[in-house]
């Protein structure tokens, strides 16, 4: 199988006052390219921590994470995060003083400063995510929650990352909007070959993914 991300013998812990709190112990797992994963578990079990580690925003205490067979530490965390991985948060994490166009363009300029995209191309691109010209010209804090999340997803995909990490992306959305967002993720996987890894508390949404990963808080590990 084509493993785009591979976790090898990973330990992660942190100091909590005088105590050491272990989150993961000897974690091993491989994520296949072009698959849709959900991560489920109790609050505080380490779901978001796992996403942060996969994004290269923190380092494991032991072990390694491989992207395309290379340790992300050797790739360089900054390069890895900018070029290969995009994160979508529950609270959208958009630049509220900018409109949808400029949110996407700002992200592109950070991930690939040499890349140019025309207004016409951006119009067509955002429209595929349900953001028409009128909405695209509004400051994003004037859009609905579902529309803001669509902009966040469009921004992530525009950066051409192969991996999309989503932390409770539907947590603030109603049921119908949540289903629409899940449909977008499915299209990214099936039509564009992206790998989507999503944290969720929603069992119904988790069952829409290809693989459900459970975090075992007692054994500090994961299983399908």
Residue ranges and their predicted role:
Residues 139-143, 147:
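Conserved ABC ATPase signature
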């Amino acid at each position: 199988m084509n493993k785009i991300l591979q976790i090898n013998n990973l330990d992660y812990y942190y100091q909590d006052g005088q105590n050491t709190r272990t989150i993961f112990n000897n974690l091993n797992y491989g994520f296949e390219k072009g698959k849709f994963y959900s991560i489920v578990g109790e609050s505080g079990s380490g779901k978001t921590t796992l996403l942060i580690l996969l994004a290269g925003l923190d380092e494991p205490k032991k072990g390694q994470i491989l992207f395309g067979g290379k340790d992300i530490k050797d790739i360089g965390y900054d390069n890895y995060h900018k070029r290969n991985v995009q994160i979508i948060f529950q609270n959208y994490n958009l630049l509220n003083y900018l409109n949808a166009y400029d949110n996407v363009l700002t992200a592109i300029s950070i991930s690939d400063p040499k890349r140019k995209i025309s207004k016409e191309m951006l119009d067509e691109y955002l429209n595929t995510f349900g953001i028409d010209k009128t909405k695209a010209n509004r400051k994003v804090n004037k859009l609905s929650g579902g529309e803001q999340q669509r902009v966040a997803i469009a921004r992530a995909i525009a950066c051409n990352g192969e991996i999309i990490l989503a932390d409770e992306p539907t947590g603030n959305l109603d049921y119908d909007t949540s289903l629409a967002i899940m449909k977008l993720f499915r299209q990214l996987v099936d039509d564009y070959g992206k790998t989507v890894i999503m944290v969720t508390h929603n069992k119904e949404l988790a069952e829409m993914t290809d693989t459900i990963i459970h975090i075992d808080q007692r054994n500090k590990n994961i299983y399908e």
